[in-house]
Regions:
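Terminal accessory/targeting
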Residues: 1-88, 105-110, 114, 233-309
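Active-site beta->alpha N-cap acidic-glycine motif
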Residues: 50-157, 161-170, 177-178, 272
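Structural recognition of the beta-strand scaffold that forms the well-ordered cores
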Residues: 87-90, 114-118, 139-142, 179-183, ...
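Active-site beta-loop-alpha junctions enriched in small/polar residues
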Residues: 94, 119-121, 145, 184-186, ...
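Alpha-helical scaffold elements lining the catalytic groove of polysaccharide deacetylases
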Residues: 99, 148-173, 187-233, 246-249
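Acidic helix-start/capping segments at beta-turn-to-alpha-helix junctions
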Residues: 124-125, 183, 189, 272-276
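Short low-complexity, flexible loop/linker segments enriched in glycine and/or proline
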Residues: 130-133, 156-158, 219-222, 279-283
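Surface-exposed helix-capping loop/turn segments at secondary-structure junctions
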Residues: 171-177, 261-264
Length: 309
């Protein structure tokens, strides 16, 4: 049912946009070398425009993705890097202009940073929104092109979904994105984990699923998230920036996190993802506003400065 709803939602989002496209690796980088242990120093309190009591970011974590480490205790238990009351905000399946921008505005009002796992079709269809995410200081990871269950696909097709999404997102963002990946439906396989490890791409599951795809009303969504968070005490929170009620709930959710003493941790990568030339070539035409072989959107090359648009 979730797959049907998501396919319909992404399909609807693309109307009017151009067609755009449990075991981890044997060895992991040492957490103490990745700057992601609980002992990592807190971020100095930053001023937040027009909000002296902003939630802000308590800690920035840099992840060394060598070997493709896995995070999120629902699937991967190698790294317990969060302190009590620390939360990582993550969003899947976007960007979608209206809802993603509403979420970005709420995050900006509280000077909070998040990680967005983008779907290639929407990243390519709305590169301006993806660049807004990047400009806001958030981290961009990938989530395939069309959101299939990769565990059910032949290896080469699954590999293409991963690599094309990396190429599209990097092209749309204007620079290589983070080597962070989340499996659609959180369905991995040993073969795909091994492949991602060979590509030095970290894999993210979750500690707390908001189940916002079931479309609870904003107040109910906030109550569910806070209740589960209070039980767990900390965690990587999974949400979706294509969900209207998630966008509506975001300002109050951030207030609830602050009121209950939770702190935000921002995930960053030690180095950006390395795209593969083969897939860069295959996806040249899959980003709106880009000519083949051009790394700049048309709007950044030709701009009307007087007269009618």
């Amino acid at each position: 049912m979730r797959a049907i709803l998501l396919t319909a939602l992404i399909g609807a989002a693309m109307i009017g946009a151009p067609h755009a496209l449990n075991a981890g690796p044997a060895e992991y980088p040492d957490p103490s070398q990745a700057g992601m242990g609980p002992s990592s120093p807190p971020v100095a309190k930053q001023s937040c425009p027009n909000n002296d009591d902003a939630l802000g970011v308590a800690r920035v974590v840099e992840i060394d993705t060598t070997g493709g480490p896995g995070f999120g205790f629902q699937h991967y238990k190698a790294y317990d890097f969060l302190n009590p009351k620390e939360v990582v905000l993550t969003f899947d399946d976007g960007p979608l202009p209206t809802h993603t921008r509403t979420i970005l505005a709420a995050l900006a009002a509280e000077c909070v940073k998040a990680t967005f796992f983008t779907v290639g079709q929407l990243a390519g269809g709305y590169p301006d929104v993806l660049r807004q995410i990047v400009k806001g200081g958030h981290t961009v990871g990938t989530h395939t092109v069309k959101h299939p269950n990769l565990a059910k696909l032949p290896m080469e097709k699954a590999k293409a979904e991963i690599e094309k999404s990396v190429s599209i997102a990097s092209r749309a963002a204007g620079a290589p994105v983070a080597p962070f990946f989340r499996f659609p439906y959180l369905r991995d396989s040993p073969q795909l984990l091994k492949y991602l490890g060979s590509r030095n791409i970290a894999v993210f599951s979750t500690d707390l699923d908001s189940f916002d795809f079931k479309r609870p009303r904003p107040k109910r969504l906030i109550k569910n998230i806070m209740s589960n968070l209070d039980k767990k005490g900390k965690g990587i929170l999974l949400m979706h920036d294509i969900q209207p009620n998630t966008a509506k709930a975001m300002p109050e959710l951030l207030k609830a996190l602050k009121a209950n003493g939770y702190k935000i941790v921002h995930l960053t990568a030690k180095a950006p993802v390395v795209t593969l030339a083969e897939y860069d070539k295959l996806t040249e035409k899959d980003v709106k506003g880009f000519a083949a072989g051009n790394q700049r959107p048309i709007s950044s090359v030709v701009r009307t400065i007087s007269g009618d648009q």
